[in-house]
């Protein structure tokens, strides 16, 4: 009966991937257990959806439950199995002819009992070799988890910058079109300024693009180094226990070097170029927008889209709470169906806001979303200390500084243009170009909590 119990516990505490006793055990949705390092490396190398290596059941998420009780079972099981130690593991003290079965915490040297009582080591803390093995093994697991988190963060940054690189040239070309469309409205003498602006934008775009490419290369190399370090730690955790104290010091130094060398993602932000006379020209079409308090539309779907977009910008390991930011919306009292109109909104005290124009019919509906038709909006969302700007139709990020005072909104109904300007900088934020308005428009303002 005792052998049956031993056989049962041994099979339960064996990893099906490495066929060894479980290290930092976890269980997935189907109930099978594996070493956390083995499962992490296996799932990262698999391009198909994450599935159990035993029963092939697909796991819906990467998060697994840690088995707290398993660690207590693995330790005595390891002790009950004869250790195949190298000859150096059973060293005999030359001076006292006794087995070195203690480890000094200070210099991590093997000692016999009499050596541990010598003046050199008497004030130091000592562990039995088996206790020290488990102590250093836990330290290794902590280092492995730290390395894996760094690798995951590096991979997220790499994916984000790869996506930016894929659309960067399109964004630069589109922004050049926006800027070029602004200048024909002003006098001929501004042509020279336009040319300088576009050339500087192209030059700045090339510089940031190269920064992104270099950062992408650094992150890719760091991912390889972190993977190698993680595999080395995994290999060390399976070595003869007596080698752990001597090797851990070098590993800790290398891990600290990798921590200091972790590449930081590039913040691809272009300069805000002043356009001469833009504020004066727009002020010719200034109107004063009042809010219609009688419109009580509740755009829950739009607010939900904003929260999820805000969460997608957060690269922390902690899950984002989509209800953390509360939004309230307001509609302008004026209905605009012709002519040129310009007004300004103070966003100085707002971190999260949505401002622009929407089709008048949306005032009577509650199903407006960020991808709905007939909305021309500029969004500002804050995550930690970073602000991101987006425009709708379609949703597009803008890598330029956010306005920190007054935001200007300009509508040219007949030409199908909606523009947003940074009043303090007299610079263009973005424009909706060559649209056809066949419906009335209303100003729309939405503010979110800080």
Swiss-Prot record:
A zinc finger (RING-type) spans 15-56. Zn(2+) binds at residues 93, 96, 115, 121. One of its GO terms (biological process) is regulation of gene expression. Residues 269-450 form the B30.2/SPRY domain. A zinc finger (B box-type) spans 88-131. It comes from the Eukaryota. PANTHER family: E3 UBIQUITIN-PROTEIN LIGASE TRIM. Belongs to the TRIM/RBCC family. This is Tripartite motif-containing protein 77. It comes from Homo sapiens (Human). The lineage of its organism: Eukaryota, Metazoa, Chordata, Craniata, Vertebrata.
């Amino acid at each position: 009966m005792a052998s049956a119990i031993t056989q049962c516990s041994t099979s339960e505490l064996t990893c099906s991937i490495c066929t060894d006793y479980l290290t930092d055990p976890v269980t997935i949705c189907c109930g099978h257990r594996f070493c956390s390092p083995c499962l992490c490396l296996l799932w990262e190398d698999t391009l198909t959806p994450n599935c159990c290596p035993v029963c092939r059941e697909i796991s819906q998420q990467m998060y697994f439950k840690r088995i707290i009780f398993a660690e207590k079972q693995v330790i005595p099981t390891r002790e009950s199995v004869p250790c195949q130690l190298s000859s150096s593991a059973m060293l005999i003290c030359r001076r006292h002819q006794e087995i070195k079965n203690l480890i000094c915490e200070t210099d991590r040297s093997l000692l016999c009992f009499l050596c541990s009582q010598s003046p050199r080591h008497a004030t130091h803390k000592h562990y039995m070799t088996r206790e020290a093995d488990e102590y250093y093994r836990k330290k290794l697991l902590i280092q492995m988890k730290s390395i894996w988190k760094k690798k995951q963060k590096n991979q997220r940054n790499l994916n984000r910058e790869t996506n930016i690189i894929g659309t960067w040239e399109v964004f630069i070309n589109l922004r050049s079109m926006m800027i070029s469309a602004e200048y024909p409205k002003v006098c001929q003498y501004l042509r020279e300024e336009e040319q300088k602006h576009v050339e500087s934008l192209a030059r700045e775009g090339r510089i940031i693009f190269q920064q992104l490419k270099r950062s992408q290369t650094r992150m890719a190399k760091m991912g390889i180094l972190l993977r190698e370090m993680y595999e080395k730690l995994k290999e060390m955790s399976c070595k003869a226990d007596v080698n752990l104290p001597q090797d851990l010091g070098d590993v800790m130094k290398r891990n600290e070097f990798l921590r200091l060398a972790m590449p930081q993602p590039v913040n691809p932000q272009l300069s805000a170029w002043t356009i001469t006379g833009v504020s004066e020209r727009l002020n010719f079409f200034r109107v004063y927008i009042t809010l219609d308090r009688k419109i009580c539309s509740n755009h829950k779907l739009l607010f939900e889209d904003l929260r999820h977009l805000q969460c997608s910008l957060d690269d922390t390991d902690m899950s984002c709470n989509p209800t953390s930011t509360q939004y309230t919306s307001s509609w302008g009292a004026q209905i605009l169906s012709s002519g040129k109109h310009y007004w300004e909104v103070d966003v100085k005290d707002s971190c999260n806001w949505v401002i622009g124009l929407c089709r008048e019919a949306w005032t009577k509906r509650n199903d407006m979303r960020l991808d709905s038709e007939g909305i021309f909006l500029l969004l500002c969302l804050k995550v930690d200390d970073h602000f991101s700007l987006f425009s709708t139709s379609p949703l597009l990020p803008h890598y330029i500084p956010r306005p920190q005072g007054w935001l200007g909104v300009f509508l040219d109904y007949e030409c199908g243009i909606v523009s947003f300007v940074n009043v303090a900088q007299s610079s263009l934020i973005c424009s909706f170009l060559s649209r056809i308005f066949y419906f009335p428009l209303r100003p729309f303002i939405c503010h979110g909590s800080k």
